[in-house]
Structures are given as C-alpha cells and as structure tokens.
Regions:
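Conserved GNAT acetyl-CoA-binding A-motif
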Residues: 119, 126-139
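Conserved acetyl-CoA pyrophosphate-binding loop and the N-cap/start of the following alpha-helix
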Residues: 109, 113-121
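Short loop/turn motifs at secondary-structure junctions and domain boundaries
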Residues: 47-53
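Conserved N-terminal entry element of GNAT/NAT acetyltransferase domains
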Residues: 1-14
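Conserved beta-strand-loop-alpha-helix junction that forms the acyl-donor binding cleft
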Residues: 110, 134-145
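Conserved GNAT-fold acetyl-CoA-binding loop/helix
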Residues: 21-46
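Conserved acyl-donor/pantetheine-binding loop and adjacent beta-alpha core of acyl/acetyltransferases
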Residues: 53, 60, 68-110, 125
Length: 149
C-alpha cells in the first residue's frame, strides 16, 4: 500500500462521484436504514467550490482513488453541489473556525490511514493559511476517525 495525495482538480470530479456514492451507501448502511441512506445522499456530496478554492484533496492507494476531503474558509459546513442552503460567505479566521468538509473514503480502502491522511492534510493546509481553529460535522461512520484524531 502506497498512499499518495494531491490537490483535487476539476478533472477528478467524474471519479469522485462514484467514490462518494459508495462511501455513503456502504459505510452508512450498518447504522442507517435504506431510506436514511438515501436521505443522506440528498445532503452529502462533493462541493466543487472546494476544488475551485484549491482546498480539496484526493488520496490514491497504488494509483487507485481511495479517498477525498477538504477544508474551507466558507460558511457552509456540509453538503454537495446539489444541497440547498449552502453559504459561500467567507469566514473571519480571527473569530470563526474553518470547516473540515466532504471527507469520504472508498469502502475498499477503509482502516488503512486514508481518512487520517486527509484530515492531517486539511489541518496542515488550514494552519498554513492562518487558520487557528477548525470544525466539522461527522457521520456515525466517520466518528471514530475524528475521535481518535
């Protein structure tokens, strides 16, 4: 296993959609029923604003897309391009935490350090941009990662 990381580009977007769909469907299903998983798809997904802002990472495992996630200076805490109520307003880093956003690990790559690497990349990049605090909203499937961090 050789994990590599880089900033996501618009060319990555077509490959991210099936990764996110697999993560939502397979990783949440132990805790949620089918209707709840479908409802999760309505509020979760990739926010291309993060890619445009240069704050979204992809992680590959031996060349295979294994995970993704980012951070944001914007007010939106969660949601993909299709999610209603997103807010692109810029946060004040002196008084407001940046957001850790849209973190997904492909189910075939869980428990291999992918999520931890994405989180570390996000925290380091946010700190380099002058951010002193971050916040996130987690799913029940992601909670163990964030509690261990």
């Amino acid at each position: 296993m050789a994990l590599t990381s880089r900033l996501a580009t618009p060319a990555d977007l077509p490959a991210l959609t099936p990764l996110v769909d697999a993560a939502i469907g397979r990783l949440l299903s132990p805790w949620l029923d089918a209707a709840q998983v479908e409802a999760s798809r309505a509020i979760m997904g990739v926010d291309t604003r993060l890619v445009d802002d240069g704050t979204y990472f992809v992680v590959e495992d031996d060349g295979s897309l294994a995970g993704c996630g980012g951070w944001s200076r914007r007010a939106t805490l969660y949601g993909g391009d299709h999610t209603e109520g997103r807010d692109d307003a810029l946060l004040d880093p002196a008084t407001q935490p940046a957001r850790i956003r849209a973190m997904y690990t492909h189910p075939d790559h869980t428990r291999r350090g992918v999520g931890r690497l994405v989180l570390q990349l996000c925290e380091a990049a946010a700190a380099a941009a002058g951010v002193t605090r971050v916040q996130l909203m987690a799913t029940v499937a992601g909670r163990p990662l964030y509690e261990a961090a």
